From Swiss-Prot:
It comes from the Bacteria. This is Protein SlyX homolog. It comes from Shewanella sp. (strain MR-7). InterPro entries: SlyX. Belongs to the SlyX family.
Length: 70
């Protein structure tokens, strides 16, 4: 059976490892949040560009006359 000191040291090592893991995961979450914010901004820019585009000269399907074989 392990001594109390060895058990304490093992718990301290596990805790240090978990703290490191939590910090690494936190950094990844921060990066992903920044990426999401950037992508949302890009989507908003694209939406603005699409709304600003001139309407197409091509007729919609409802406006098209059916082909002669109908």
């Amino acid at each position: 059976m392990q001594g109390v000191q060895e058990q304490i040291e093992e718990l301290q090592m596990k805790m240090a490892f978990q703290e490191l893991t939590v910090e690494e995961l936190n950094q990844e979450v921060i990066k992903l949040n920044q990426l999401i914010a950037h992508q949302q901004h890009q989507i908003q820019l694209l939406i603005g560009k699409l709304k600003a585009m001139e309407p197409s000269n091509i007729a919609t399907q409802a406006e098209e006359t059916p082909p002669p074989h109908y």
